[in-house]
Swiss-Prot record:
InterPro entries: BRCT_dom, BRCT_dom_sf, DisA/LigA_HHH, DNA_ligase, DNA_ligase_AS, DNA_ligase_CS, DNAligase_adenylation, DNAligase_N. GO terms for biological process: DNA repair; DNA replication. It comes from Helicobacter hepaticus (strain ATCC 51449 / 3B1). It comes from the Bacteria. Pfam families: BRCT (PF00533), DNA_ligase_aden (PF01653), DNA_ligase_OB (PF03120), HHH_2 (PF12826). SMART domains: BRCT, LIGANc. GO terms for cellular component: cytosol. This is DNA ligase. NAD(+) binds at D30, E31, Q32, Y33, D34, S79, L80, R131, E165, K304. Coiled coil: none annotated. The active site is at K110. Zn(2+) binds at C398, C401, C414, C419. Keywords: DNA damage, DNA repair, DNA replication, Ligase, Magnesium, Manganese, Metal-binding, NAD, Zinc. It catalyses: NAD(+) + (deoxyribonucleotide)n-3'-hydroxyl + 5'-phospho-(deoxyribonucleotide)m = (deoxyribonucleotide)n+m + AMP + beta-nicotinamide D-nucleotide.
Amino acid sequence: MTSQEYYTQVQILKKMAYHYYVLDEPIATDEQYDSLYHQIVRFEEENPHLIDASSPTQRVGDVPLESFSKNTHLERMWSLEDVFNYDELVEWVQRIYKSYPQATFTCSPKFDGASLNLLYQEGKLVSATTRGDGVIGELVTHNAKTIQSIPLEINYKEEIEIRGEVVIAKEDFEYINQDRLSENLSLFANPRNAAAGSLRQLDAKITAKRKLRFMPWGIGAGLIRFESFYEAFNTITRLGFAPVPFLSYCESIESIQNAYNVLFSQRNNYPIMLDGMVIMLDKIASQQQLGWTIKSPRFACAYKFPAVEKSSKILSVSLQVGRTGIITPVAELKPVEIEGAMISRATLHNFSEIERKDIRLGDEVIIIRSGDVIPKIIKPLVALRDGTQKVISKPTHCPVCGEELLLEDIFIKCQNLSCEARVIESIIHFASKKALNIDGLGEKIVIQLYENAFVRNIKDIYALSIQQLLTLEGWQEKRANNLIYAIQNTIGVELWRFINALGIEHIGEGASKKLAQKFGLNVFELELSEILSVDGFGEEMAYSLVEFNHANKTLIAELLCIIKPKVELLEIDNNNVFFNKTIVLTGTLSQPRDRIIKLLESKGAKISSSVSKKTDFVIYGEKAGSKLEKAQSLNITTLNEEEFLAQINK
């Protein structure tokens, strides 16, 4: 095979793959595809310098990764507002009509899988990032390349983010679980969990075996170049992605409802799990003008399918103890399948809820589950009672430590700070992402450390040694070193993270940041009146903080000595042009972005990750891209780095 013949054969193989994996319309037999595939592999092994990066043979890497890197989306991946019935749909559409009486809409299926953001530059796939928190996700490019329905190259030279859902067909999901059962591995709960787990494999060869599909649903960066969302969908298909099924262009509420009815009627027959329909204002310019709330875009919503109801029997009630000591009753159910997931437990929330609904042990109960939502018990089927049902009694003593419980409003609490369950939950929270972010210290590891008496409180984490860890089952030197390094890496962490990590009731991430910026280390010595002076703090938060500081004075002092959190008191300059303004940064700047953000925050600015009509300034560097274009289209003031520095130093 000559080099020219090789490139021709690669194009033929790509066409075969596209028709088989994307269009589901094979143009060659499996034998023909495999034969050509192996011919190309042999040529590439003999001529590695001539390999075409877009060849289907290059989708699976040879070397597994050790961990996932973080990656920032060019445009934020937002959550959508939910509507659940026709009345709520009408209310949502009427809000759009107030601004745009002639508005039209694009409707598409809401796939039940794992969201993925694909970045293409100069027509090449350069990164694939999970949704994460919407701003930053995990880089899974090596796995995305194994998904045959994701093009490695597209005929589009501008920078663009193609977004979609990674899914597994219902039939393929059954085969995966059958294989796992034969290998004595734990089963996936549903196709969504299987897709998400497959996407996060460190070894791409495992991902490649899972028959993942990519179903596109939108565009991030680059959307501003289109006039219509419907047009954008058609462009995505022309670029080589899977056609969007049940795509509808709707001009009225009635046509939206009709599209929903069609989709709902096909829900069970369609090979991929669906959990609703996405409704999007079609005109892109109108989308930009409507903008976003703190959580979601104003121009789109998810019209969810009704929650699936099933009945099951309450076999017993177990009690969970949280880090704040609150006892949560959990119903242990006779297993029942709902939407492809086996449900055997459902929260009962609290004992007041049990009394209000008159739920009893042995009751047949109605359970609902919608999408990712934790299963809920709606009501008992009273007519089916046969006299064997028993009242669910409130506990008087902690199920873990045996201490007497306190009844506080609707909650029942264990007050023993040394209770095993409270200690374990508090350490899990302490190590979590929004707290000290100790990589590798998750729930299973914390329980293992506690059961082996290596930790009895948060402080004990910092006394762990590699020698101790190596005595535990499943631990090797590299893993032990990584955990000790991650723990030591928390020394000097930002004060707000330290406050949040303590798990003070009613004091979350936002409150922790305010306290750290305003009071510094004095936060642990505050009077009630001082806390109440902070904007947004009520009596419940203030009492909780004062009581926690008093009860844990020694522990806080010891942790401060070990961790030495970084104190950054924020002195606001309210005379600056950026005071109380919303700023977006884009492009490559000469100074570290964190330094510029800190400087802007010291001037009272609010930093945003996306451009909308509420943005006051966009500060841009080299290769600014779509955010700068969007700002210019909305007539937002834009400043290059030199202009920004001149303004901020006035």
